[in-house]
């Protein structure tokens, strides 16, 4: 259901427009092979060509020279102040790349970017901030040892031209923004001590402090669903419709893969597929042309389209004739108590001197079992993740007591909490997929080849051709049809998480710790992940899933046991299939 745009816009509204924007990335040689293969050619090139021949090129991408990878192609879009514009699409469609071009983090290969009719060239994010465009990243980066106040004012002197800052006035302004938006922040808090939700608000505070005209929200997952409604209402009240924003209202660009949220909060929706803007929808005209039943039917069918593995085109979105509803995931059979346990946590405690204390955490995971632990960052779920994956530092490591036991071939190993390392976990068959895949699970400067190889084919006897076939096979299994020699930064957040999971499963672990499994995944990727985890569990691998909010019914049905982490304590345990009353609240 595509409704054409009509009416005359007010001349006072700001316009941010893209004209024939395209972005391609050159192929990069793996770091370990650049010296020799740069002269004589890469011996694994045939494996890559075979993979492309077997599975076909990336759906929707334009054909380019073999030395390039196309991410965006001929994108034409316009964004206006005084409204919320949603960029909707599946993982890898090009939404985040488009947001990075708008915010100066990425330079387009060709095309023009115009602000109020004037061509703009953003070489660095500082240029975009000066023009009034700020971005709130999905995984923001801060000065960890600085306070919230210091992170907010950092760089303000270069942006405003004022070499000195009146602390009293700046503090008053920051306090006013925090109070107005009801942010759970304190200026004196150190960023290293903040949870993922609070770090999102710090990034938003940094953008609002610079009084932007456009705010870009890249996959905003600031809080559970009930709090997201409050956040978007504040966003529309205090920024989009506010008379204090530049030119009587600001513009918001939301990058998301959730059509229900986009239809609820955005005035305009653009569908990005295969690096192209293939469809456009004005939600303010739905009430005029459609009934409530038709709108609900539109939500269901577009959600099914985004969940479908096939390419979503404008005709498919407009007709909705060949789309079907999705089926829920089947429940994994309960684990027999006779199976040996793989992981046992006994009386794990983090004292009150740490950032978030934990009290008497005890549970065990048997082979083929799936344990789900749900809790907010304030309850300590991220601290538990750091301890289990051994990524904790500082007070959490110093004040941590208890036992973490691993059973392997009838031998029990007790991991030293103060001296444990990730390499020791891997030596005992433990694989980890962290919640922050960009900073903890990957290096964005590496190629996909370098990212996938190190934990499996790492011996000097393994030839490059075999390594390249291995990488191409992993990418093909995840339905990511791209060149293994392209940089990891060209992948979307959801694609990167799928690639890291494939890398960890390639090691054939006995225990898999997966944090925030549904973070940044669209419906199709989420269904694929559910099926993959079910197969892994049936093969004998024990799984521990850590999440900060309740997932849908199929996720709860996937777990053989579920725990709730509240105030640093496992206060509840639910087993079996969820009741109908629980499903109704999802």
Swiss-Prot record:
Keywords: ATP-binding, Cell inner membrane, Cell membrane, Membrane, Nucleotide-binding, Repeat, Translocase, Transport
ABC transporter domain segment(s): 46-299, 343-586
Residue numbers binding ATP: 89-96
Lipid bilayer topology: Peripheral membrane protein
Task performed by this protein: Probably part of the ABC transporter complex RfuABCD involved in riboflavin import. Probably responsible for energy coupling to the transport system.
Record localization: Cell inner membrane
Broad class of the protein's primary localization: membrane
EC number: 7.6.2.-
Signal peptide: none
Subunit text: The complex is probably composed of two ATP-binding proteins (RfuB), two transmembrane proteins (RfuC and RfuD) and a solute-binding protein (RfuA).
Any single GO CC term annotated in Swiss-Prot or TrEMBL for this entry: plasma membrane
Listed GO MF terms: ATP binding; ATP hydrolysis activity
Family classification: Belongs to the ABC transporter superfamily.
Name assigned to this protein: Probable riboflavin import ATP-binding protein RfuB
